[in-house]
Amino acid sequence: IELHRQARREGWSKHEFLVRAAQIPGVYVPSLYDVAYNDDGTVKSITANEGAPKVVLKRVVQNMDEAYYPTKTIVPSTEIVQDRVSLELFRGCIRGCRFCQAGYVYRPVRNRSEKLLRDYAVEAVEDSGYQDMTLSSLSTSDYPHLVELCDDLEDFCAQRHVTLALPSLRADNFSMALMERLQKGRKTGLTFAPEAGTQRLRDAINKNLTEEDLLESCRRAFAGGYSAVKLYFMLGLPTETDEDVLGIADIAAHVMHAWRESALNKTRGVRITVSTSWFVPKPHTAFQWEPQIPIEEYERRVKLLREAMNTKSVTYNWHPSPTSFMEAVISCGDRRLGKVIETAWRKGETLSAWEDYFDLNRWMEAFEECGLDPHFYANRRRSEDEILPWSMISCGVAPGYLKREHALSYEGVTTPDCRTHCNACGANCLVGGKCDV
């Protein structure tokens, strides 16, 4: 902003302003990079013009406690999806799931102090009037002071009738002490994300979670009075087989058995919700070279799982295929897709994230008019030697680390979390050499 003000005062040209802006660490100026393509459509070269860095390195907030935190939120007059206070405990993730873009690009881990979080929570509730608060992060239960924070907020939440909720939890560190603190307010359901139906596939994606971890957490929850559990999985993960798909139904049945074993009050019954999404390869992850399975194959796997879900108390929800296909196309796309997006918009495509507005036919017509094949982006396996459209951007994680993780996935070898062992991903360079794990 200061540079733009200076440009206006001194009468710079647009190009001069952009060149100066490119000198600011973390600023990417697309027009200062020339991209050439091979005959097969892959990227041949990405050349930085004079004044632009060859690779733009992401900038991060160094100290979360010193960063501005918005507690005076705008409260809309209509009901919205995120109708609550959302308290971010820390940024980054220690886990390293190989499919997760956020887990890579938000590295390194940087925690907020427990005392400041308590103050932020009180201010946000008092200023907004919300009666629901979510303690959010990529893996909330990995916050090192979570139990202490819940203790600090316990009396305040009880007095203000505020429900304290956690998003998807790690089943391998879910504790009874944590559950008891959640029970102080209005009880809500619990959500776990095993992601895959077999141990082999969970190891391949580096989930570092066993079925027994999940079942033990469910037993504790059911014994503590919970009667609703949501389980999140993905279909189409690299190396997935029908056995892995059917393993999801097996896990749901085992969770049902855990409820029968552990629930103290069975009169209310149990609600187990299994939700599956479609794997979308994302840039800057260990699976950025992987293809998305074709729509027909995804729908076959959904049908296979749906037919295997024959337990009355288990509800199965799945993500529609057309929107996930287009998400993969755009996620793995290059700058040529800009014209496609504009063409689709001119055809009337707006608010495409909503199924009511999304029209795959309009998108396919736009691709045809622009002479591009969407399957080239979504369903093609990429060589690790290929220049990727996002190669001029670095999130701090070394490309060699991603290649190593990619290879380990096919070997079924897991990588320990950052708190257990530093895996030398390279993201520590963003915070002076030491992560806050």
Predicted regions and their residues:
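Acidic, low-complexity intrinsically disordered segments
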Residues: I1-A102, P108-V109, K115, A353-Y357, ...
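Glycine-rich beta-alpha loop elements in corrinoid/cobalamin-binding modules
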Residues: I1-T47, A286-D334, I341-E355
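Acidic/polar loop patches that form or flank catalytic/metal-binding clefts of enzymes
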Residues: R8-K14, A36-D39, Q131-T134, H161-A165, ...
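A glycine-rich phosphate-binding loop feature that marks nucleotide/adenosyl-phosphate handling sites
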Residues: F17-S31, L138-Y143, P167-N173, G236, ...
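Active-site lining segments that contact anionic ligands and/or coordinate catalytic metals
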Residues: I24, M64, Q82-S86, I94, ...
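Glycine- and acidic
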Residues: Q82-S86, R98-P108, Y130-S139, G197-A204, ...
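Conserved SAM/AdoMet-binding glycine-rich loop
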Residues: V122-T273, S277, P281
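Radical SAM enzyme core and accessory elements
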Residues: N310-V437
